[in-house]
Amino acid sequence: MTGKIIKGIAGFYYVYVEETKEAKETATGGTLYECKAKGTFRKQKIKPLVGDTVDIAVLDEEKHIGNVERILPRKNELIRPAVSNIDMALVIFASAKPDPNFNLLDRFLCMMEYQHVPVTICFNKKDLITPQKQQELKSIYEPAGYRVMFTSTKTGEGIDEIKHVLEGRTTTVAGPSGVGKSSIINCLQDDVQMETGHISEKIERGKHTTRHSEIIPIKDGTYIMDTPGFSSMDVPGFEKEDLWTCYPEFVEYEPYCRFQGCSHINEPDCGVKEALSEGKISQVRYDNYKLLYEELKNRQKY
């Protein structure tokens, strides 16, 4: 039997098995199995991750207890958060109240770029800003190649568009507190079958439990992962020299730099700074680049 690990805690792995075609007429959704991992994984120094697709052996069908027998090949593996098989990241910030922290947003974008995960940006609380402000926010991130969406959990605007973007994917959802992330997740769960509520109860999902990464089945083939905080840039191997490669809009202009290994800060004849002066790169993004570069530089000293 094959399923997906949706939560791992204290040596137990909770594996969600989607409903079978035969069971569709009577079942209310998939089934959750509480599993332990076989000792062979420990010997091979392999740790199952949230997001893994696994084969399980059922030990007790009535109590839904089993063993993880095999981990199927991973499409990708994120270091922070430690999860696998992610198709996309959805990062949620408020349009206002609180105003978006662009430095924090750019940190997250860099982390995902470094780990090769496509990102969609969602600005919630659309009802609090003008169309002009929406355009301002778009102008910072759309030139960098990011999809920018606006939602309002108050009016319901944009929620269907988000559902469409998430469909058929496993998406990690992140965002600081106070931006309406939980409200959006609740809206996305409107269509979730009854069994998922039971699953949430079984794995003790609560309002303040995002200390652990956890996958929420939305419907068969569509999953979202509620992700803990992301302010740290502590990804092994991530150095200041890598930072510019995590700014997609810099990559286009880097070949025009006079010096190889240009940091795009102090060097003359820099293609990136030239693009900045021509308004092709956002000043907000560039200012954050300099701050993050300095932070990584200082970290390397120690």
Curated annotation (Swiss-Prot):
- Return the Gene3D superfamilies for the record: Nucleic acid-binding proteins (2.40.50.140), P-loop containing nucleotide triphosphate hydrolases (3.40.50.300), Probable gtpase engc, domain 3 (1.10.40.50)
What does the UniProt cofactor note say? Binds 1 zinc ion per subunit.
Q: Which InterPro entries does UniProt cross-reference here?
A: G_CP_dom, NA-bd_OB-fold, P-loop_NTPase, Ribosome_biogen_GTPase_RsgA, RsgA_GTPase_dom, RsgA_N
Which GO molecular-function terms appear in the entry? GTP binding; GTPase activity; metal ion binding; rRNA binding
- Annotated compartments: Cytoplasm
Q: Spell out the GO cellular component terms annotated for this protein, sorted alphabetically and separated by semicolons.
A: cytoplasm
- Predominant location: cytoplasm
Keyword GTP-binding in record: yes
Q: Which residues form the CP-type G domain?
A: 75-233
State the top-level EC class: hydrolase
One of its GO biological process terms is: ribosomal small subunit biogenesis
Q: Tell me how this protein assembles.
A: Monomer. Associates with 30S ribosomal subunit, binds 16S rRNA.
- Family of this protein: Belongs to the TRAFAC class YlqF/YawG GTPase family. RsgA subfamily.
What is the designated name of this protein?
Answer: Small ribosomal subunit biogenesis GTPase RsgA
Phylogenetic placement of the source organism: Bacteria, Bacillati, Bacillota, Clostridia, Lachnospirales
